[in-house]
């Protein structure tokens, strides 16, 4: 019987599963202390305040969890451990906040050997297995749909150059950099790239996430980082095709910077990908404008997600009355959470058509054969399964069936006009 079990809720759609797992643990081992944590748990812990959960970690877990385990071993009150919500009967007590953010250099590098037996299950896009690397944490920007800055208070922390170099050296050929704001700050990013080159690091593939304004204003970073991988993809938070739409989500950049960043990255030999937000309040002309923008500027590798008010964000707070009672499994960015302006049937017709214009559509400009030409022979079966599975995103009927099934749980409401504006 374990003394402590940790249950993760990294995303809002995992709240219910996390509670289910916690209850299973308690049913098997009633005396086990159950700690919930993860990004979603920390930024919006309310859905996890359930009978089977003993405490919720509401800050970085790297120092909180060892402190909690020590308190349990010494039988001292867990309410003395900073950064927790602790169940006490039917009430919850919030312990004192941590005095300062955890230094990333105080966090040990991942013990990846512990998951070697499952390594083949870690994959990203065409690349398998994949390794995750963190060089920084947090984001100082304040996008209305994003919970990262809310959790970390707009702070931004960096791991030291030497530690990052060692981490890159310890990983395999396919690396996903999990930073929310890669290439930032520019001076440190340039120093890091040079240190990695000096160490002789070169990967088969790297994927990093960044903002277009950071790249557009610092093209020298592209030159410095490009030698580090045979294929290097940059994922941009594209979000929208107009300045007005960017302003509505407080993106703090403009379309000109998006285009400048994409042009510079392509010219330097990078793959350009990213994501656009599809607003349920769109009219038909908004879909047409996005299609025209994608076609004109070559963003066919981008993805499209339905604008989703994630818990803990300003957008969630604004829409809370219309969202009341919606089940958490719908917060996957492919379900509707309020009644769309065009009605669900027409909305999904246009949403599916948007996906059909993407590179994932095997019936489009890039055929299935075209996809397989760039895949290693050993990966063909894997990528074929992935591509065939994604084809349901091109079918309005598949979305509509899921939508109607979900509405049996809770009907949608319209968003008040004042919130739409």
Name each model feature, range by range:
Residues 47-65, 225-234, 289-304:
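Structural recognition of alpha->loop->beta junctions
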